[in-house]
Amino acid sequence: MLDRIKACFTESIQTQIAAAEALPDAISRAAMTLVQSLLNGNKILCCGNGTSAANAQHFAASMINRFETERPSLPAIALNADNVVLTAITNDRLHDEVYAKQVRALGHAGDVLLAISTRGNSRDIVKAVEAAVTRDMTIVALTGYDGGELAGLLGQQDVEIRIPSHRSARIQEMHMLTVNCLCDLIDSTLFPHQDE
């Protein structure tokens, strides 16, 4: 059992090292995309399923409340957080549309959709991205594996942060770290003197 525990830590560390080599440019571009949208008076919609939903909610909470230092609230909405909306849509057997309907209702040109999907193939996330494209939104996608169907939907203005792993647990861990990096970069760019 102890060896298995050590193996989990070792694999996680190795994934972090690989991500630290491969992802800084994509994370930087994603952060600047989010910052520019906020500076233009727009908002960030975010969504995910399971652990990815938790990461989406963590991002939205860190924008609305704060990340590590006090600062003004920033507009972000986790589309997976409203159980009444979610169950109303799924009750009509529109599972694949659970986020797309919200994107069409709430998204505007200049907004950003932060779409989090471990494999990039979740139908409801793919449909949300398709809806965001029709609304002239920019997409920041956090993926893993080969990026899945989601990666193929992204345009030149969009950013994919693909974790270099084929293990869901490692990808989800790195998605959380990436979300924290994005929050830190947004805060340090928009409020450079808040932590002094």
Curated annotation (Swiss-Prot):
Domain SIS: 34-196
GO MF annotation terms: carbohydrate derivative binding
Superkingdom in the source lineage: Bacteria
Keyword flag Repeat: no
Keyword Lyase (UniProt): no
Keyword vocabulary terms for this entry: DNA replication
Stretch forming the signal peptide: none
One matching Pfam family: SIS_2
InterPro entries, per the entry: DiaA, GmhA/DiaA, SIS_dom, SIS_dom_sf, SIS_GmhA/DiaA_subfam
Example GO BP: DNA replication
CDD domains per UniProt: SIS_GmhA
Self-association state and partner proteins as the record states: Homotetramer; dimer of dimers.
Role: Required for the timely initiation of chromosomal replication via direct interactions with the DnaA initiator protein.
Family: Belongs to the SIS family. DiaA subfamily.
Protein name per Swiss-Prot or TrEMBL: DnaA initiator-associating protein DiaA
Species for this entry: Serratia proteamaculans (strain 568)
